[in-house]
Regions:
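Short glycine-rich, Thr/Ser-proximal phosphate-binding strand/loop in the N-terminal lobe
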Residues: 34-51, 127-131
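N-terminal G-site helix/loop of the GST-like fold
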Residues: 16-40
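Anionic-ligand binding patches
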Residues: 5, 13-18, 31, 53-136
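Short glycine-rich, polar/acidic loop-and-turn segments at beta strand-coil junctions
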Residues: 23, 43, 82-84
Length: 136
């Protein structure tokens, strides 16, 4: 947090946050924390590159979302991406209820991994963090 002095007073200036995500869950999470932010929908190609691992994929997509054009008063950009992998295959987002049922059937009783990458970008720095969880 930065501070400014004005006529003998210190004014705290909060960095303005932009959430680069179309996820309603991520938006709701920030709202529940009382954080002020704006939302942009990062219009990027989320296709998996040939031979790309799940970890490399979520880190790349998260970083690309953070690199999206943002409002001028943005000090910090927050972006994230999550994917599920099973036996080295990246499972995409189901497009309908049938796809979702097929995916759940494929995952049922098997250990699979959920990878989430979070990218935080400021004017001077960019950091991407990764969390992988094994789920059965």
């Amino acid at each position: 947090m930065a501070s400014k002095r004005s006529a003998g007073q210190t004014i705290i200036v909060q960095p303005f946050l932009t959430l680069a995500s179309s996820s309603p869950r991520r938006k709701a999470l920030l709202q529940s924390l009382g954080i002020k932010f704006c939302v942009i929908n990062p219009n990027i190609d989320e296709s998996v590159s040939q031979f790309e691992s799940a970890v490399a994929y979520v880190k790349r997509i998260s970083a690309e979302k953070a690199a999206t054009q943002t409002p001028k008063n943005t000090a910090v950009i927050l972006a994230a991406d999550t994917c599920v992998s099973l036996d080295g295959d990246i499972l995409g987002k189901p497009s309908n209820a049938r796809d979702a049922c097929e995916m759940l059937t494929r995952l049922s009783g098997k250990v699979h991994e959920v990878h989430t990458a979070v990218t935080i970008k400021s004017e001077t720095r960019i950091e991407t963090l990764l969390v992988t969880t094994a789920v059965k």
